[in-house]
Amino acid sequence: MRLSIKTCTLDMPFAAMLDFCVAQGVQAVEIGTGNWSGAPHIDLDELLGSETARQRWMDQLRRRDIALCALNCSGNPLAFQKDWEVTEKTFRLAKLLGVEKIVMMSGLPAGCPGDKTPVWITTSWPPETQDILDYQWNEVAIPKWKELVRMAEDCGIRQIALENHGMQLVYNPETLFRLREAVGPLVGMNLDPSHLFWMGG
């Protein structure tokens, strides 16, 4: 197992960030590509559009013997088109870079057709919560996640690791297994204990 780090919190240029990682003994990096993760160390459009740019970017990693373990596009692809587009671009770039793991969040739909605000339901009462959940899962999440999984498979992605974060449709084992049963085992969990702490775990 390699010691790795999610780099988007490191406020420094790409090369300087990699040098810092080497100095700390970090052997692999998870690069944020946009949405909530930010993208301080990668330009999705540039790398998608230029093999030369991809080669130059990857050479920075190779020279330092740092592996690219995952791309992170955490956002809400179930509610916002711009987040869906970044997710789609991230999958396409993963194929071009040979990356097989994506870290992201499940997303959270609105509560009904025509609503624009994501609604996080964590209780079974009052009864209307079940109508909201039925809409979120069966009308939005499962169809869209089937599409995402097909897209991921077409791009050679073998694992989508969902953060167990609050204000997401998938945030605990029960909701993860519900999604896996619907879309298959390509979807798993990126276990972040810090999320459990603030959710009272």
Kindly label every feature range from the protein language model.
Residues 201:
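Bacterial c-di-GMP phosphodiesterase catalytic domain signature
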Residues 42-48, 72-81, 135:
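The substrate-binding groove and active-site-proximal loops of carbohydrate-active enzymes
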